Amino acid sequence: AVKEGKIKLKDRDIVAVTEAVVAKSQGNFATVDDIAKDVREKMGEGTVGVIFPILSRNRFSNILKGIARGCDNLIIQLSYPFDEVGNPLVSIDKLYEKGVTNFNKTYTEKQFYKLVGKIEHPFTGLDYIDVYKKICGENCRIILSNDPTTILKYTKKVISADIHSRHRNKDLLLKRGAKKVITLDEILNHSINGSGYNEEFGVLGSNLSTDEKLKLFPRDTKTFVKQLQKRLCEVSGVKMECMVYGDGAFKDPVGGIWELADPVVSPAYTSGLTGTPNEIKLKYVADNQIGDLKGKAAEEAIKEIINKKSKNLKNQNVSLGTTPRRYTDLLGSLADLTSGSGDKGTPIVLITGYFNNYADE
């Protein structure tokens, strides 16, 4: 692609590789039965609670299927009106119409249906209460509550199925009397009968592969990015930065869904991508620090301000509006938006000139 496009590579250009390519090249797959066996070994007999799962067939249906097979009885506690990343179980407008303006009450499945009537996801049309109950079969009941400790009224053994708040909820449940709590990163964090696994993230970041199989988040990614950087340097003579990326960290302004269903945007990256930008706001500088200068004089004045800027602009007026986010979160989101989630066929993204600024010649 570089040769055909006559692209001139430079130091600090970035090669981003989607996690799916890495995971598939590793053969990092597992089955629903692998999950069931691991859950049974870790949770034992009796009733198990599952709190705050994401509302997604791609992300959670096979995980739930495996959990259900590994448990005698299951109680699923859903948050409402949204899951953790903003997927709506039911329209918030519908709840407002029913007079529900705060969400601190606990409902049984029957009570919730009586309150809202038909449940329908605004985009897919699915009723996720029905979807998840059908996946689990007869040994399942569903409650709705936004308090993670509600589940302890039903069982003291809990799987915290949330993604980004899992550690906080696990700690809270244990402090409030839970006997056993695991999170999704503790399921398949080792191989079961030769299955794939991820020692750091377990089944977090996994995707549905077939009705009985999941593709797991890739492992050994730190080694992969270092080897890729070394090989690219040998071939091109340029020291590029490399990263593996999954979901971007952006929020859909129409649907209100935060797209980050993976545990992290980037599980591994080379050292040059560590840190956050340290930038000044050009609009602020232009309005406040260059006076009546115009044209070339204004341009040179702004470049001088950039070149002399402090190494830490935190809480300084010149940095207003430049919220510092990690390079890997920004770049991974850029790569994910570029590659898309469907049939673009762009599993590798080249990003050039990202670290340039206005003062660079």
Predicted regions mapped to residue ranges:
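Conserved mixed alpha/beta catalytic, RNA-binding, or beta-rich assembly cores of soluble enzyme
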Residues: 1-11, 20-361
